[in-house]
Every structure is written in structure tokens, then in C-alpha cells.
From Swiss-Prot:
It comes from Drosophila melanogaster (Fruit fly). Induction: By 20-hydroxyecdysone at the onset of metamorphosis. Residues 142-210 form the KH domain. Disruption phenotype: Flies exhibit wing blisters and flight impairment. This is Protein held out wings. Changing residue 185 to C: In allele how-E44; embryonic lethal. Abolished RNA-binding and ability to regulate dosage compensation. The keyword Protein biosynthesis does not apply. The lineage of its organism: Eukaryota, Metazoa, Ecdysozoa, Arthropoda, Hexapoda. The gene is how. Keywords: Developmental protein, Nucleus, RNA-binding.
Length: 405
């Protein structure tokens, strides 16, 4: 084989080898892309499986009656705290202007949420553009007192301090007034004013007078909304099932300052339970069988108002003079029964321990004239002269004795 032929064979083999490598590379790339696609698909499937489920928050309509009661209670607690803050802020008028505005807005918002019966939120009234001149429109909604003579419709419409009617006026833009027989609280005043000018409504049956001033197209919408809301209030509810009445009484307690915060009540209950447990443990320790005489000697402890109970010893007499310290007083007898346990115990009072123990140093001072107490000298006769020397306890001088000075 010639050199040229050998070169051609080598080139052909080299081309085949390169083609095989290229085909293998293409297959490897395809396999790699396929593996990546499979891995991405598996990752997406795992993410879909592990993705948290979207939990739709429970609206008040979906709450159970117990959950609705707890929600109403928490709203009332918050409203009571806001009103308390508002009263405290009234001591600084025109100082915290923005704080007062924000607090008033929050009180209005919380109060509106308090009166969302069955989770029904009242949407703001949508009014058309004003057209024409301003007119005054009114309508009467009669109260069914003949069908339900024992039901308090007036209190249900007005609410505590007239707050329900005021809120309805703000929502509808109408003026709401209770008129007719039985609309006044003072029956004597009502009878006296019946038939007088400007009191003609007392001759009519009990009704709700709704008045609005606006353009005709807007006044019609406002009046219809107010009539619908008043008619809802005129539907009597069974005793104990009137949610509006419960919330009105709750608001009245908040306004009067007699509302009991549930958080403070729970703290008081826990504190009372803690005091009861402490008293029970103390009584158990005092009545233990190993110390039969202790219950009779020590006074039963009372729970301290701000801390753990204290056991106070009876009032003790503390010696203040040397005579009381040196008085011969016997030690008190043992307070425990030594039979059975062999314990020797003499309960000395530490404040009077020196006198009870009979300290030998104190008794030694009592027997000598050079002790702690100095003897006082007394004159038997009066002095003839203020500067005259007096001799006490000195024997008389013998006759003929001459004193040399």
C-alpha cells in the first residue's frame, strides 16, 4: 500500500471517529435536556403538593354562635378601653388634636362593627348626582303597638342615650323622631300637652317620623333607605334572642362605666384561685399530725393583698429597763408534747431571752455595789448655807481632833 492510500484510510477513520463523537454528544445533550425537563416537572409537582392550602378567613356569617359571642365581647372590651382613653384625653383639651381625631374615628369604626348583627355589614349609601332644587320630604312609619303591646319599641329604636337613632341618622342622612301616643317618657307631661299647639302628634298613634332635606332624586333614595332600616327595628324578637338589645345594653354599660372587662375578670378569677390554693396549703401545714400544738399556738394566717401570706407572731413585751431584765422570771414551758418523738424544745422569745436564760454576768452585777447601777447619797438634814459642805456616812470626829489642812 502506498503512502497516499494509507493517508486516505487514516483520514477516513478519523472522520468516522469524529462523526461518532458528534452523534454521542448530541445524544448526551438530548438526554440531559430530557432529564432536566423531568426534574422540573417533578419539582413543580412537589411544589403543588406541598403548597399551603388557601384558607378563606371565616366571616361573621360563618362563625358559630359561641364564636360570635366571643367576637362581640372582644369588640365591647376594645370599645370600653377606647372610651376610657377618650375620657382621660379630655383632661388635655386642644393639645393632642390628631390623637383625638384618630381616637374618635376608631371609636366610630368599632361601634359600627359592634352593631353588625349576624355579620351583616352596612354598606355606605350610594347617592346620585344632585338634580334640581332642595325639597323636604317626610314619611311616617307606624309602630305595631296594638299587635305587640308589651314590647318596648321606643327603646329599641332610640337605643342607649339615643345612640341607635343617631347612628341611623348618620347612615341614612335623615332625621328620625319618635312621635305619637306613648312617645314621651313622662305620661303626665304628655297628657298635659295633648291638644296644644306644636303637640298635635300626641293625638296620633305611635309612629316614627322620618324627615330629609335634599334634592328630590337624592331625598327619595335616603328616605327609602331610612324606612327600610326602621322597619327592621320594628320586628319584635323573642326574649333572650334579641341581639340588638344585648348590644344596646352592653353599650349602655360601657357609657355608664359599669361594664366589666372580661380580661380584668379573668385576672381576678386567677388571683382568687391562687389565694385559695395558698390558704389551703397553709391550713394543711398548720394542721399537720407531726406538730399537734402548733395550730393552737400560732394564729391562722390571712392572705396578704399584694404577696405571699405572712405569719405574724403575737405582740411581745420587750424589756427596756435593767430591773425588768434582772427580774427573776422562769422560762416558759415546752409547747410541744415530747412523747413519741423525743424532741426537747423550749420556745424562748428572743427579745426577752436574756432575762429568761438567767445570764450569770447580769446577776453578778446585781450583787455588788460596784456594778452598773450607781448608789445615790441622800442628805438627812438641810444645809444651813448654800456653800456648806455636807458629809454623808462619815463617822463623827473624836474630841480633841485637829484637822490639818
Amino acid at each position: 500500500m502506498s503512502v497516499c492510500e494509507s493517508k486516505a484510510v487514516v483520514q477516513q477513520q478519523l472522520q468516522q471517529h469524529l462523526q461518532q463523537q458528534a452523534a454521542a454528544a448530541v445524544v448526551a445533550v438530548a438526554q440531559q435536556q430530557q432529564a432536566q425537563a423531568q426534574a422540573q416537572a417533578q419539582a413543580q409537582a412537589q411544589q403543588q403538593q406541598q403548597a399551603p392550602q388557601v384558607v378563606v378567613p371565616m366571616t361573621p356569617q360563618h362563625l358559630t354562635p359561641q364564636q360570635q359571642q366571643q367576637s362581640t365581647q372582644s369588640i365591647a372590651d376594645y370599645l370600653a378601653q377606647l372610651l376610657k382613653d377618650r375620657k382621660q384625653l379630655a383632661a388635655f383639651p386642644n393639645v393632642f388634636t390628631h390623637v383625638e381625631r384618630l381616637l374618635d374615628e376608631e371609636i366610630a369604626r368599632v361601634r359600627a362593627s359592634l352593631f353588625q348583627i349576624n355579620g351583616v355589614k352596612k354598606e355606605p349609601l350610594t347617592l346620585p348626582e344632585p338634580e334640581g332644587s332642595v325639597v323636604t320630604m317626610n314619611e311616617k312609619v307606624y309602630v305595631p303597638v296594638r299587635e305587640h303591646p308589651d314590647f318596648n319599641f321606643v327603646g329599641r329604636i332610640l337605643g342607649p342615650r339615643g345612640m341607635t337613632a343617631k347612628q341611623l341618622e348618620q347612615e341614612t342622612g335623615c332625621k328620625i323622631m319618635v312621635r305619637g301616643k306613648g312617645s314621651m317618657r313622662d305620661k303626665k307631661k304628655e297628657d298635659a300637652n295633648r291638644g296644644k299647639p306644636n303637640w298635635e302628634h300626641l293625638s296620633d298613634d305611635l309612629h316614627v317620623l322620618i324627615t330629609v332635606e335634599d334634592t328630590e332624586n337624592r331625598a327619595t333614595v335616603k328616605l327609602a333607605q331610612a324606612v327600610a332600616e326602621v322597619q327592621k327595628l320594628l320586628v319584635p324578637q323573642a326574649e333572650g334572642e334579641d341581639e340588638l338589645k344585648k348590644r344596646q345594653l352592653m353599650e349602655l354599660a360601657i357609657i355608664n362605666g359599669t361594664y366589666r372587662d372580661t380580661t380584668a375578670k379573668s385576672v381576678a378569677v386567677c388571683d382568687e384561685e391562687w389565694r385559695r390554693l395558698v390558704a389551703a396549703s397553709d391550713s394543711r401545714l398548720l394542721t399537720s399530725t407531726g406538730l399537734p400544738g402548733l395550730a393552737a399556738q400560732i394564729r391562722a394566717p390571712a392572705a396578704a393583698p399584694l404577696g405571699a401570706p405572712l405569719i405574724l407572731n403575737p405582740r411581745m413585751t420587750v424589756p427596756t429597763t435593767a430591773a425588768s431584765i434582772l427580774s427573776a422570771q422562769a422560762a416558759p414551758t415546752a409547747a410541744f408534747d415530747q412523747t413519741g418523738h423525743g424532741m426537747i424544745f423550749a420556745p424562748y422569745d428572743y427579745a426577752n431571752y436574756a432575762a429568761l436564760a438567767g445570764n450569770p454576768l447580769l446577776t453578778e452585777y446585781a450583787d455588788h455595789s460596784v456594778g452598773a447601777i450607781k448608789q445615790q447619797r441622800r442628805l438627812a438634814t438641810n444645809r444651813e448655807h448654800p456653800y456648806q459642805r455636807a458629809t454623808v456616812g462619815v463617822p463623827a470626829k473624836p474630841a480633841g481632833f485637829i484637822e490639818i489642812q
